[in-house]
Amino acid sequence: MKYDLIIIGGGPAGYTAAFEAAGNGLKTCLIEKRDLGGTCLNRGCIPTKTLVHTADLYRTVKGDTPDLKCADTAVDYEGLNAKKENIILQLRGGIEKMLKAGKIDVIHAKATMKDAHTVRAGEELLETENILLCTGSEPAMIPISGIECEGVITSDDILRDLPQMEDLIIIGGGVIGCEIAGIYEAFGTKVTVIEALDNLLPGMDSEAGRSLAMVFKKRGIDVHCKTKAVSISKDEKLTLAYEEKGETKTVSADHILIAAGRKAVTDVFECEAPSMERGRFTVNERFETSIPHIYAAGDIVYGYPQLAHTAMAMAVNAVCAIRNVPFKRDLSVVPSGVYTCPEIASAGISEKEAAEKGMQAISGKANTLANARSLIAESERGFIKVTAEKETGKLLGTVMMCERATDLIQEAALAIERGMTVSELLQVIHGHPTFSEVFVSALEAAEKKI
């Protein structure tokens, strides 16, 4: 049987592409070697957010507040892992039903490409007009001695079966490292975070990273930025040697989590592979690789953020390109979120990035101290900062560190994508009392500078 499209990889990019292709009349086959849903559903976004939710609840009930006294509260790790697995199974079952309803052929096997029109799925050879690579990513390891020691783990290991720990060292202060640090701190684990760059969350606004470090330190997490991991050794516990401010120091723990980013999975070629940069495929404006009829979407594509919602949008547009119809998704503004407590989210560009692009920009900022909902929720101090073009007032970017930031950022993303100005946004009445009123205060601060 010859297909119009074979998709390799059944994560967010893969199954989204399958729905889009089959829904528009393309004979479609989806090949996945593991579980449908990919990293996001099985070893990433969904299990992490399940654990974050429980951690936030536990942090609340164990806190010393005047209105809530909960004695003998404890984390049931067995129950928490079961809850996580049930959520994964429920969501995976939904994907399976939708694929079946769409009459999409699903093959569970290791896929490799013989050429641009032939795919090997296990022992079976399949012919196709086009191939879409959605093979995703996996945890990247760092080249230091002792990395092979028992107890050195990745996010895959933690999210497969959450272990109870007395202490944990996390190498990497990015999104994954910070989210897991927050989870384990809430559960009573002694956490140490080692980050090589200047701030936590190096890919986001520096103020957010510095503010999160202050929150972490207040809660007892040891944070070491501008610090290099040197080596790992094992005796009764694991010991990490690290360099900080010219000195070599050590710290010990039950486990060491390597959270130093992710690398693309690209081992799917029996033929010549498409062009790559920094380990990821390069694509043109149609998401086509250097080899005609071979497309790519998701974490494996160079130049795009490794986010599930980005992957899904890329997949839809790649199928549009295959069908020779206009794109359905605008990838110029991609919101991102960090599920710490408080949450952090951003969309668009910062004032510094605007200046680097030759734009004259201003920013407005409001903190959460005077916000009624934040006070009611006993939130940590947070802020919302907006960046706008000085001449036109057009909103360019927003960063938030507050309750519900990952939900609130959608309003900012929509406004940036639609080219709305600060004054236009201020015409919209926001409810009271809501967390979103801090966004209004930030806009008002910006308007005074325009």
Predicted regions mapped to residue ranges:
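FAD-site-proximal beta/loop scaffold in flavoenzymes
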Residues: 148-164, 250-322
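Beta1/beta-strand and adjacent pyrophosphate-binding region of the FAD-binding site
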Residues: 1-13, 165-174
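Core beta-strand elements of the Rossmann-like FAD/NAD(P) dinucleotide-binding domain
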Residues: 1-3, 122-130, 246-255, 290
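Rossmann-like NAD(P)H-binding beta-loop-alpha module
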Residues: 162-204
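Glycine-rich flavin
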Residues: 2-3, 19-26, 31-164, 192, ...
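Short glycine-/small-residue-rich Rossmann-like dinucleotide-binding loops
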Residues: 11, 32, 136-137, 244, ...
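Flexible, glycine-rich terminal cap/loop adjacent to redox cofactors
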Residues: 8-10, 16-34, 46, 50-57, ...
